Amino acid sequence: MLPPYFLFKEMTDTQYIGRFAPSPSGELHFGSLIAALGSYLQARARQGRWLVRIEDIDPPREVPGAAETILRQLEHYGLHWDGDVLWQSQRHDAYREALAWLHEQGLSYYCTCTRARIQSIGGIYDGHCRVLHHGPDNAAVRIRQQHPVTQFTDLLRGIIHADEKLAREDFIIHRRDGLFAYNLAVVVDDHFQGVTEIVRGADLIEPTVRQIPLYQLFGWKVPDYIHLPLALNPQGAKLSKQNHAPALPKGDPRPVLIAALQFLGQQAEAHWQDFSVEQILQSAVKNWMLTAVPESAIVNSTFSNASC
């Protein structure tokens, strides 16, 4: 039986619940807006709830004040969420409960292998510590893979096939430095919040291959997935904080929203100057067509650092 702290009490109805879950490693940029807007429109078009979660579980990567700035940016662009913001930094007890349960069930083990060793064997962990019975000192925790996912269905892209070696890897769920791994925290929180569909960027397809097995280990219903196209800079790299993509403009949000809608293949108001942010979004929800969203990544120089 799962610990009650992180067990989600199943909802009595089948309401759609989506979410946007940024990490506070910097301000939102155009690529972030694509993910936020796509998930928002999908939720609102389904008469569902749209939640926001701040994934602040990796302090070394976080920028002071970025979380608050992200929330202000969402509001400035008219993307208003339902309920309270969930902060992963306040969910450590739930992650500990999840780790303890997996350990008690024999579904995880301690690993002392270094990155250098794993790189030396090709970059995919080989299960070296599975039967060595290490203790917790100076060790990471790995899942004992029971349900390798070699393919899954994406509602935009169809069946996505995964690298079999990657799918079978015993991946880390608690880091050697004591931080909770992204994949564990995301699954525990998405289940806790009752998320029924995850709409996010295509750069997160690989983590999906790791997250679905965690749902299955916990005995939870797996949500649906949609992976949106990525915005690229002229050099072909994903717009990201690491690549110094500029923050979303602080002025009139409407032209940026129109550009984001067009990026997603959606009908956009031709005379947007005559409409408010709220009216633009209302129209976008009414006319939202997932089938019109392109699958491929798209170069967008307008909001990349090439235009700065």
Swiss-Prot record:
Q: Which GO terms describe its molecular function?
A: ATP binding; glutamate-tRNA ligase activity; zinc ion binding
Q: Binding positions for ATP?
A: 241
The record's keywords, sorted A to Z, are: Aminoacyl-tRNA synthetase, ATP-binding, Ligase, Metal-binding, Nucleotide-binding, Zinc
Per UniProt, the short sequence motif 'KMSKS' region occupies residue numbers: 238-242
| Keyword ATP-binding listed | yes
Q: Which domain of life is it from?
A: Bacteria
Q: Which cofactors go with this protein?
A: Zn(2+)
Which positions does the motif 'HIGH' region occupy?
Answer: 22-32
Keyword Nucleotide-binding present in the record's keywords: the answer is yes
Q: What EC number(s) are associated with this protein in UniProt? A: 6.1.1.-
Positions of Zn(2+) binding = 111, 113, 125, 129
* GO CC terms, sorted: cytosol
Which is one Pfam family of this protein? tRNA-synt_1c
Q: What class of enzyme is it?
A: ligase
Give me any GO biological process, just one: tRNA modification
Residues bound to L-glutamate: 19-23, 55, 182, 200
Cofactor: binding details? Binds 1 zinc ion per subunit.
Please name the SUPFAM superfamilies in this protein's record: Nucleotidylyl transferase
Q: What does this protein do?
A: Catalyzes the tRNA-independent activation of glutamate in presence of ATP and the subsequent transfer of glutamate onto a tRNA(Asp). Glutamate is transferred on the 2-amino-5-(4,5-dihydroxy-2-cyclopenten-1-yl) moiety of the queuosine in the wobble position of the QUC anticodon.
The entry sums up its family as follows:
Belongs to the class-I aminoacyl-tRNA synthetase family. GluQ subfamily.
Q: What is this protein called?
A: Glutamyl-Q tRNA(Asp) synthetase
Give the species. Shigella flexneri
